[in-house]
Amino acid sequence: MILIFGGTTEGRMAVDVCEEAGKPFYYSTKSALQQVELCHGVRLSGVMTSDDILNFCHQNDIHCIVDAAHPFAENLHKTIAETGIKVIRLQRQFGDKIDGITYCKDYEDAIQKMLQSGVLNLLALSGANTINKLKSFWQNHHTVFRILNREESVECAKKNGFPIDNLIFYPDSMPDVEEEKRMMSVVGCDAIITKESGETGGFEAKVKAAMALGLKVFVVEHPQLPADWIYVSGSHTLRRAIQHLVPDFFPLKTGLTTGACATAATKAALLSLLCDEYPEEVSFALPDGEVLTIPVECSSPGTATVEKDYSDDPDVLKGCRITSTVMPNKTGDIRFLHGDGVGTVTLPGLGIPVGDPAVNPTPRQMITNEIRALSKVGYDVRISVENGSELALRTFNYKVGVVDGISIIGTSGIVSPLSNEAFVESIGRELQVAKAIGCTAIGFASGKKGENALKEAEPDLRVIHYGNFVGEALKKAHNLGFQRVVLGIMIGKAIKLADGHMDTHSHKVELDLSKWGVTMARQLWDVMPPSFFTEIEKNCWKHCRTVFPDGELEVRLIRDANV
C-alpha cells in the first residue's frame, strides 16, 4: 500500500498519478481544507504524531511513502525518515540562487542577518507558522505579516501575541509582480523575508517585486532531506519511481522514447568529452520541463549508450541499445549525422530535410537543449541503434519514407502503453474518476498534442487519452452517463474513423494516402479544400454516434504538428 503526505500542489499531482492505477492508496493532509479529487484513494485529515504515523504504516502494510508535503514541514519529514520505509520525495523546483538576495540557513540566521543589515520595517511573507520563529525580531522592530485569510492562521497570530492590526491577507488569487509591488509600497517596508518555496507559492513574483522597489530580500533556504530518498520532480518521474518500488501497483508500466534515450546518451557523451567524466547516470529535461535521471554506459570519450527500458507497450524497440557519438566541429552549429541503424528521410512531411538522419524535431530540440546547457561551440551528433536496420523491418517506417533504419522519435519522452486490454481498462478508470468528482462533460484525445489543443479551447475540460480506442472510450463514456463528449482527433486517425474503423491503430487499419498525392497525413491540410475536412468531421460524428447515442457529441479535427 502507498501513503501520500500532501496538502500541496505536489500532493494533488501525486493523487492524480496514483489514481491512474485504479487501486487503493492513502492521502494524508494536516487539515481538511484542501479540496482534492479522490476516487480510489482514501483521505486522511488531521495532524498525525510520530507514533500515529508509525502505527498507521505498520497496521496498513505501507510499503512506500510519497512525501509531497511542504518543503518546510520539517517535523513531518523527520518522522517519515524514522519509519524505515522507502520514501519518494516529490520535490518542487527551487531554481538557481539569485544575486542580490541574502540567503539564510534558518530563522535564527535570518534574524541575525536582518539585524546586521539594519532592517527597520519588515514585511514577512513566510507564513503564519513562522510568527513564533521570528518573535524576537518583531517584538523590537515594526513587522507586518501577510497570512492566509483563514481562522487557524489568525488564531496562530493571536496565540503568539502578534498585533492583529499588523496582519494583512493574501487575495483570493496569487498576485502577480505588479500587484505585489503595489502591496509592498502601501506597507512601506524596507525589507521582506520569505521562504525558498520553489516555483509554486508565488516566490518569483515576491522577489521580483521587492528587488524592483529596491528592498532588501531575505530568503530562508529549504531544509535538506535524507540523501537515501528517491527524489522526483513531476508526474512522469513519480510514476517511474513507484513502478520501481511497488512493481505491482500500476497494471501497465510506462517507458522511455527513443528520443529520450538518445538525449541521455548524447549528454553523457558530451560530459565525457568536456569533463573527462564517465557518468553512470545522467539527468535531462523532458519537453515539458520535468527532469529525468536514467542509467547510461560511457566507456570512451565522446560516446555513450542507453538501453531502452521496458514498458508494457508492444514496442519492437524495447531493450535496444541507442548510442550517441559527439565530436566538436568548427561550424558553431549542432549537426546530426548518419549513424548505423537510424533511417534516412526520403520523403517530405516529417519536418526533417530529405536526406537527413531520421531524428525527429522534438528529440533534436531535446538534444540541442542539453548540449547548449553545457557548451556553446559546434558539435556533430551521430545517433546509432544496434540492429536498427533489422528492427525497422518490423515497423511502418517505409510508409513515411524512412529507409534503412528506425526513427528517433517522441513528443513527450515517455512511452505510455496503448495497445492491450489493460489500457482500455485504464480509460474506464479515468472516466470513473471524472464521474466521481462531478464531471458531466469529458474530452477525448489520442495523446498529449490533442489534449493541449482541446484544453486551449476549453481550459476546464477534463481530457482523457484514448490512444487508438475511440470506440471503447465512447462506449464507456455512454455507459457512465456523461452528458457531453468532445472528441479531438488528428487527420490520419480521422480518415480511418470516418471510414467506420473505431480502432485506429496502424496494425489494424492501413491508411492509403497515395490517392490524394501525399505521403504524410498532415500534408492533407495543404492540398485539400475545407469541404474535405468538413466531410471527414461529419462522417466521424456519424460513426461515433453509434456508440455514444445520447448526449452532446462534438468532433474536432486537430491540425497535426511535427513529431
Predicted regions and their residues:
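N-terminal beta-loop-helix "entrance" segment that forms/cooperates
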Residues: 26-48, 99-102, 154-160, 291-295
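Short, polar loop motifs at secondary-structure junctions
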Residues: 27-35, 90-95, 128-131, 148-152, ...
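Glycine-rich, highly charged phosphate/nucleotide-binding loops
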Residues: 40-60, 169-179
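Glycine/small-residue-rich loop that forms an oxyanion/phosphate-binding "nest" at active or ligand-binding sites
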Residues: 54-110
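Anionic-ligand binding region
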Residues: 127-167, 177
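A C-terminal functional module that forms or caps the active site or interfaces directly
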Residues: 158-165, 170-187, 191-213, 218-222
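Generic N-terminal targeting/processing segments that precede catalytic cores or assembly contacts
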Residues: 249-398
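A structural signal for small-residue-enriched, beta-sheet-centric alpha/beta enzyme cores
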Residues: 253-256, 400, 406, 411-534, ...
